[in-house]
């Protein structure tokens, strides 16, 4: 069985627990996911399950993807992801739903692409304190010294400088499943998840 599923981010909300405390949650629409391929040690060198998510139109996928999905008797799918398997593997072409993998109180990790922020300076990108705020200072939000002099006469790789921020694959771990809506395939996890509304995510048990 796979240890995770594919889904998309719906948005954030809040719910109340039995003690009346507010819990901020992220709502995820998870699955149903079809099994497009089952990998084995004999054929592939490792065990894994490839899942397909979200129907799409035929012209939006390549011919190779179309033939690959046809082997599992599946129509065009927008997203393919692979998960390491454990225990008995489901049959190719079968469908996995939320209740097959997750339960309330499970601890999970969620992977998605973070929001893109464009080109940002060191204060926003790396959290630098910046310089004095007074009028006499000519140094407010600049990077400052980069730590190189006549030897070695260059800036080392990896120095925290301005640049393109966000829009990177990010994983948030140790999120707790607070609630599950099986009818609408919704999973409510505590805390925040990378990305914007409709960002494709993967959710896995830890």
From Swiss-Prot:
Entry keywords, A to Z = Ribonucleoprotein, Ribosomal protein, RNA-binding, rRNA-binding
Species lineage, top-down? Bacteria, Pseudomonadati, Spirochaetota, Spirochaetia, Leptospirales
Give the superkingdom in one word.
Answer: Bacteria
Query: Which Gene Ontology cellular component terms are annotated?
Result: cytosolic large ribosomal subunit
Q: What InterPro entries does this protein map onto?
A: Ribosomal_uL3, Ribosomal_uL3_bac/org-type, Transl_B-barrel_sf
Q: What is the role of the protein in this entry?
A: One of the primary rRNA binding proteins, it binds directly near the 3'-end of the 23S rRNA, where it nucleates assembly of the 50S subunit.
Assembly: Part of the 50S ribosomal subunit. Forms a cluster with proteins L14 and L19.
Disordered: region residues: 122-154
The protein's name in its UniProt record: Large ribosomal subunit protein uL3
A GO BP term, please? translation
Please give the Pfam families that the UniProt record associates with this protein. Ribosomal_L3
Q: Which family does it belong to?
A: Belongs to the universal ribosomal protein uL3 family.
Species of provenance: Leptospira borgpetersenii serovar Hardjo-bovis (strain JB197)
GO MF terms here are: rRNA binding; structural constituent of ribosome
